[in-house]
Amino acid sequence: MHIEKIELQNFRNYNNLELEFSKNVNLILGKNAQGKTNLLEAVYLTAIGRSFRTSKDLDLIKFSENNAIVKVWAEKELNSTTVEISIKRKGEKSSEKFIKKDRKNVTKTSQLLKNILIVIFSPEDLKIVKDEPEKRRKFIDRELSQISPKYYNSLSNYKKSLLQRNTYLKEDNLEPSIIDLWDIQLAKYGAEVIFLRKDFIKKLSEYSAQIHSGITGDKEKLDIIYEPNVEIKESLSEQEDFIYRELKNSFKTDSRNRNTSVGPHRDDISFIVNDIDMRNFGSQGQQRTCALSLKLAELNLIKEKTDEDAILLLDDVMSELDADRQEFLIDTMKNNQLFITTTELDQNIKDKFDEIKIFYIENGTLI
């Protein structure tokens, strides 16, 4: 799988831009704050339907303009696809998004999933091991949603029910019968989320362990462990019943705190290397090796589930890795289309790949 071409209009700091890409490596060079990451963001947007940097589509429209357009042409093993996303300004604080896939209107973002497979690796991802649990949950949600529309739908329904329950908990004179409506929904969708996360993290751990062993020369053993907020049961129905009972048991606490304390929105994952929890006791080098292993495992898992090689976006991450980790990353990525942003041309990268295109970006313009 690879992206052949992109067109931008009024996207971030770009007026109009049209680029044709290499199937192999695309180096995007430029000083800081010139628009390199904006270009990766545009590519990512057409794959996932949303930005990896902001939850506000309005931020994607160039200042003083009323609309932004991103269009890509992508080639898969058996067919080609086009995705066009238009964002229109509605007043000062809101916007409207329109998506077309192969010239047909898309009404739900989930309809884009599995169309263009993509993995983003940025300096922020290197902090995932030591960051707060919310960042690790977002990582799991983002990657699992991309290969499992069922997970995306279950998670979306869970979040909607959670928001409604939490909103109601902030009111006075709560009615147990109304809370029960949300408890039923949270139990159902929460059980689905937990079971899908469990299987995904197990497989992710297996791939990560193999990669981590290769990076460290078999000196370290990595385990990624799922830490659910509730006990995991044998069957989906048992899990649903258990979450429902736990929600009932926590009602007094939740009503006092005006927040839901039970469910997968409080899950976490741990990174254990040689029986040591890297979240609290890992060195920066160990934490970065875990993060790199995790990202490369994503690519392997996507390949297993879809039989496609995902596109990899490397956003100013090469300079954050030492020479050995850079070498391992480059050697592993021979079958993937790469987009690499950097401030300086790395001769090592240039020498490693046969087909490479270099783009120089200055203030949203190709030079």
Segments the model singles out, each with a brief description of its role:
Residues 1-31, 178-188, 192-311, 320, ...:
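Conserved NTPase motor "head" modules and their coupling/switch loops across ABC/AAA+ ATPases, GTPases
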Residues 72, 337-344:
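Structural recognition of the conserved hydrophobic beta-strand(s) that form the central parallel beta-sheet
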Residues 127-217, 227:
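An accessory alpha-helical subdomain
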Residues 36:
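Conserved lysine of the Walker
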Residues 315-317:
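Walker B catalytic acidic pair
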Residues 45-57, 297-305:
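Post-Walker A helix-loop "phosphate-sensing" segment adjacent to the P-loop in P-loop NTPases
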Residues 48-127, 133-135, 144-147, 151, ...:
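Nucleotide-state sensing region of NTPase/ATPase domains
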